[in-house]
Amino acid sequence: MLKRAFFPPAILAIILIGGGVPSGWAQSAPPAPVSSNFGGELTSDFKYLANNFEADAEDIVTAPLHLDAAGAMLTNPRFYLIVGGAGAAFGGSFALDQTMRSHLRSMGSSTADLLQNVSYASVSASTAVLYGYGLYSGDSRARQFALTAGEGAGIATLIDIGIKAGFGRLRPSQSPSHTAFFHGGQSFVSGDVTPMFALAAGVSEYYDNTWYISIPIYSLALLDGFGRMGNDAHWFSDVVGAALLGVGTTELFLYLHRQHDENPGRFRVFPVAPPVTSTHGAQSVAPTGIGVAFSW
């Protein structure tokens, strides 16, 4: 179907498509200078992805060795607000499973497919335009947020495969009970919705979650969930669970990438130039190929 064939090229477009300026910037900022160093920017972005992908894997694998950081997190009230909010959202959606199904299951398949295709096209294009704007204007932050969103979408989709296998929930079309877990099904969580929310999170975060960006982009991502429910392929809690997974994965990688930027002395697949200081006590090691960059 169109919606399944569309998504892989759309993710690829995050890296390949150029041109276009986000509307929020067009209204609030003067025209950005046009960058003429596309080749250098693409090379820089490839190194950014490679360096952070390696560092992300290292951070996740070694996380059990840094439980002291978890202790600090547990003393932060914001942690409990986030966990409580996520739990309330999922619990509420689970309670509404049957109600939402009764209202959406009668949706025609053509309408449901249209909602899904609109969601795929708009969210993926928004992320691609953000990356294209970064190329056009030389805004590395825009490109990095788009690339991180793409990474989040890909990793969250892989995690979703494991969640489906672990919970085995039957789809609404397979069982009228929304508690039919561990029956070899693949309903929980939605693999279609997960990457949409991961991409939407990157766009929203680039604009500091400003409401006039966040509400439209997350609403467009949610259209995919409504389309899936219209096709009787998912429960409402499958959609909300997928949204939490997608957003959470992108937010995690954005956080980790900020930490990597603040620690330039760690191992890099591609060496990076250390930050310039006002003294003469700085020395850089920047060999070609695989290496390490240090800053004193």
What residues fall within each predicted segment?
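Residue-level signal for short amphipathic helical patches enriched in basic/charged
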Residues: 52, 95, 106-107, 210
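Alpha-helical transmembrane segments
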Residues: 82-87
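Alpha-helical transmembrane segments of multi-pass membrane proteins
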Residues: 89-98
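Short coil/turn segments at secondary-structure boundaries
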Residues: 99-103, 176
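Membrane interface segments of multi-pass transport proteins and intramembrane proteases
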Residues: 102-111
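Extended ligand-binding clefts on enzyme/binding-domain cores
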Residues: 132
